[in-house]
Structures are given as C-alpha cells and as structure tokens.
C-alpha cells in the first residue's frame, strides 16, 4: 500500500507539473500523531522511506515542512503553522492561553519564517 501511495503521488506530481499555472511555495503540514522533518531520522512523515520534500525540490518546487504538536488542537496547529511560515514569536493569544491554562508565548519558540512574504499577493499551497 505504501509503495502504491507514493507511486500515485509521484505520478500525479509529474503529470500535473505541465498543467500547473504557478510555482507557489508548497508547505507540508503533518496531521494527528505526525512528526516534523527533523524529529524522526529514519522515516519521513511525507514519504516514509522516500523523501517527498526532497523529490519535489529536485524537480524545481520550493517546499517546506512545518512541525506542529502531534496531539495539539486544530487551533494550536494553525497558530504554529502560521508562525513557522511567516516568522516571529509564537503567540497563541491571551484569551486562548488563559482559557486552556497554557503559556501564551512559549520561550524559545521564535521562528525565522520559511516564507515571510506570504500574503494575498504571494500565495502558498498548504498540503496537510
């Protein structure tokens, strides 16, 4: 099953390349119980034994993989994804942090940003 999934993904990537009308950066976001690119060295969330991010880069795409909490809420994952893309101090917001008794701005969670110019004029593709 894993080989079929990877093969289908790669086939769709190759065949749709000629149909693509843009080269917006691709942001890969793992799901529930997932992991980031550097968190498990032997297996990639996006590709298993293969490396989908590296493959897409090899054919000319700009690709980034964000790492969010594996059991975090949708809200927390969205905030973490936003700051990893845009950059800045991770900030869950005062109301959310107070409501769930969590740190609003976790120490050491400052991101350079994969694509700080993300905006209406500079869109991205989010794949999750």
Where are these regions (language model features)?
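N-terminal signal peptide c-region/cleavage motif recognized by signal peptidases
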Residues: 15-16
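Sec-dependent signal peptide recognition
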Residues: 2-8
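N-terminal non-catalytic accessory region
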Residues: 19-127
């Amino acid at each position: 099953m894993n080989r079929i999934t990877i093969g289908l993904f790669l086939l769709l990537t190759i065949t749709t390349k000629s149909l693509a009308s843009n080269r917006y950066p691709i942001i890969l976001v793992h799901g529930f119980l997932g992991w980031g690119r550097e968190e498990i060295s032997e297996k990639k969330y996006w590709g298993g034994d293969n490396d989908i991010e590296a493959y897409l880069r090899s054919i000319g795409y700009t690709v980034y993989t964000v790492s969010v909490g594996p059991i975090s809420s949708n809200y927390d994952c969205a905030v973490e994804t936003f700051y990893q893309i845009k950059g800045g101090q991770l900030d869950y917001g005062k109301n959310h942090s107070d409501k769930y008794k969590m740190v609003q701005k976790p120490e050491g969670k400052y991101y350079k940003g994969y694509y700080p110019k993300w905006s209406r004029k500079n869109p991205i593709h989010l794949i999750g």
